[in-house]
A protein has these predicted regions:
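A juxtamembrane structural motif centered on a specific transmembrane helix
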Residues: 1-5, 22-26, 359-441
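N-terminal membrane topogenic signal
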Residues: 1-17, 63
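Membrane-interface alpha-helices at helix entry/exit sites of multi-pass transporters
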Residues: 4-7, 159, 182-185, 269, ...
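Transmembrane helix-loop junctions at the membrane interface of multipass transporters and ion channels
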Residues: 22-32, 86
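Hydrophobic alpha-helical transmembrane segments of multi-pass inner membrane proteins, especially
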Residues: 35-265, 307-362, 389, 393, ...
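Re-entrant/interfacial helical elements at transmembrane boundaries that shape
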Residues: 149, 208-209, 271, 287-293, ...
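Glycine/serine-rich anion-binding loops at beta->alpha junctions
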Residues: 153-162, 199-201, 280, 284, ...
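TM-adjacent membrane-interface loops and short helices in multi-pass inner/ER membrane proteins
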Residues: 258-299, 303, 312-314
């Protein structure tokens, strides 16, 4: 069975590499003069994919290889589109990808010893709130939200990393407590984070945090009624923001009638829809569209660019890949006998799912657009690095499950006292991490 899985993963890896090869060869001929730099960039991208694959295979022998290949494909699509739009930005994105892999490796190390996360959750919570408070005074405004910090001329978005920290903090707290009344502190933390994001006018991130919290709350407690009450409270908050913030009312009005304000505020939505329509089912071809007519074509509206040049069918395929990543992440969570690992996997899966839904739904005019990025695809270092950290969480959870299953099979065959001590330094007698081995999530 293992050999069949390896063959399947090898085929997916080959398909990802073939896509990168074909796309960059096409880009090298898309200009009037042959672009040799496209082939060099192609070699770097393919090397990055192979290095990531080998690192995960070496460090996490029981990790989710298919998920890793799906993430690599999304990153490759992003790099192809960025190079087609602006080769300088594509190089920056490649550097961000390398940093993201390092961040993923850091998460792998932290998740190996989640007992450390228990001790760090309070300092991490204080730091998260402190950073968001600091943004109120030193934050730079971009796209209507005051959520950027500039250090040595480099802009980054702290809220992207607060999202990851929130998952780990909530998982650490909720893994010890399942009664609703004992979850007051993590709830206050989540509410504080969401409120600070609303004050910064980063409503997309606030919505994202709220949905992730509700997912983790339900996974921890199983209280559907209380979760629905929380969802209703979030809905009430969203309604209140409509009446409080002028830019929210304008955004909703533009979403409802983009053609009525085509020459002004509705231009972005209209251009995005026209780009998707002009691409048709199979696309205009890589390099043949007019993506620069769309505002924010490298970030918020990159999905419209993908559909214009690769087609609606390809766009649906991208959505299917997100869905498959989320399903595999949720299955990893459900299969774990460790509450912390399970909640981390649920939180990471929910974050990817909601973020992809919000941005793609906004581009296709299903919901009002909010300024968040398309996971693993949009241009931006903060988002890509944070998404790779989420990938690290999911890979660690899958590897943990595989190792625990291997230990159980060994114990069944040879007995529990026959020297299988691979996990003794990180797990208790029941195979779960020391502080969270009470039972299943």
């Amino acid at each position: 069975m293992g050999s069949f899985k390896r063959i399947g993963v090898a085929r997916v890896l080959a398909a990802v590499l073939l896509f990168a090869f074909a796309a960059f060869v096409l880009l090298s001929f898309s200009k009037e003069a042959f672009d040799a730099k496209a082939l060099l960039f192609m070699a770097l991208v393919m090397l990055l994919i192979l290095v990531q694959h080998m690192l995960l295979a070496w460090l996490l022998p029981h990790g989710d290889r298919l998920m890793a290949m799906l993430v690599s494909f999304l990153m490759t699509v992003g790099l192809v589109i960025q190079y087609r739009l602006n080769s300088s930005n594509a190089l920056n994105q490649l550097v961000f990808s390398c940093i993201g892999i390092v961040a993923m490796l850091i998460m792998l190390v932290l998740m190996k010893k989640p007992v450390v996360m228990l001790y760090l959750r309070i300092p991490a919570a204080i730091a998260s709130v402190g950073i968001l408070l600091a943004l109120l005074f030193i934050g730079k405004e971009y796209g209507g939200a005051v959520n950027w910090i500039s250090i040595a001329g480099i802009m980054f978005q702290p809220s992207e990393f607060v999202k990851v920290a929130m998952i780990l903090i909530l998982a650490g707290s909720m893994s010890e407590k399942t009664e609703v009344k004992k979850l007051i502190m993590p709830t206050l933390f989540a509410v504080t984070v969401a409120a600070l994001l609303v004050i910064q006018r980063d409503l997309g991130a606030a919505m994202l945090m709220a949905m992730v919290y509700l997912t983790m709350f339900y996974a921890s407690t199983g209280k559907l009624g209380t979760t629905l009450l929380g969802a209703a409270a979030c809905g009430a908050g969203a309604t209140a923001s409509y009446f409080i913030f002028d830019h929210v009312r304008r955004r909703v009005a533009v979403w409802q009638e983009p053609w009525a304000t085509y020459s002004t505020s509705g231009f972005q939505i209209a251009q995005g829809l026209m780009a998707i329509a002009s691409g048709g089912l199979w696309g205009m071809g890589l390099g043949e569209g007019s993506p620069k007519l769309i505002p924010a074509y490298q970030t918020d509206y990159i999905f419209a660019v993908i559909c214009e040049e690769f087609g609606i069918v390809f766009g649906i395929g991208i959505m299917a890949i997100y869905l498959l990543i989320v399903i595999r992440g949720c299955m990893t969570a459900l299969n774990s006998n460790n509450r912390f690992v399970s909640l981390c996997a649920f939180g990471a899966s929910a974050l990817i799912a909601v973020q992809a839904f919000i941005i793609i739904g906004g581009v296709i005019k299903l919901i009002p657009l909010t300024g968040i990025t398309m996971p693993y695809v949009s241009y931006g270092g903060s988002s890509l690095i944070a998404c790779m950290m989420l990938h690290g969480i999911l890979q660690s959870a899958a590897d943990y499950n595989g190792r625990m299953l291997e230990r159980e099979l060994y114990d069944e065959q040879y007995g529990a006292d026959n020297g299988y001590d691979e996990y003794d330094d990180e797990a208790g007698d029941d195979g779960a991490y020391e502080y969270s081995g009470e039972g299943e999530a």
